[in-house]
Design a protein with these regions (language model features):
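Conserved N-terminal glycine-rich FAD pyrophosphate-binding loop of Rossmann-like flavoproteins
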Residues: 34-55
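Beta1/beta-strand and adjacent pyrophosphate-binding region of the FAD-binding site
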Residues: 1-11
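Short, solvent-exposed loop/turn segments at secondary-structure junctions
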Residues: 10-11, 35-36, 121
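Glycine-rich FAD pyrophosphate-binding loop
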Residues: 6, 18-41
Length: 128
């Protein structure tokens, strides 16, 4: 089977990783109009619950994320000059660019074809 993914953002990359793991013989190609090191947007934050989903679905992605993201489990809530610290709510975060680099790395490790600076104007080129 051949799968073409249009868009090399986090969703397209992670879909490609999980699909390639589930169907290793599948030929998956991602087409992204920007360069591999381009990034738009700011930071990305995941909760502990989301991290547990990464761990259950792709431990390699989880390990990369935990090794490169900042992690915290305390939050300060301030109101009217009073600050309250809340613990037990784990989060991790990084720049969007870092997340894209990690997911691109995982795609390559799984054998996903990545095509950058590939503006797709006509989907018929992918018809079989």
């Amino acid at each position: 089977m051949k799968i073409t993914v249009i868009g090399g953002g986090p969703g397209g990359l992670y879909f490609s990783i999980l699909t390639k793991k589930a169907m290793p013989d599948c030929d998956i190609s991602v087409y992204e109009r920007n360069r591999a090191d381009d990034s738009f947007g700011f930071g990305v934050v995941f909760s502990d619950e989301t991290l547990s989903e990464f761990l259950s679905r792709d431990p390699q992605s989880y390990d990369l994320i935990r090794s490169r993201f900042a992690y915290w489990d305390e939050l300060d809530v301030a109101r009217d000059g009073e600050k309250v610290r809340i613990t037990g709510n784990g989060f991790c975060g990084c720049s969007r660019k870092t997340l894209l680099q990690l997911l691109q790395q995982r795609c390559l490790e799984e054998g996903v074809n990545l095509n950058f600076e590939a503006n797709v104007d006509d989907l018929s080129q992918f018809a079989d």
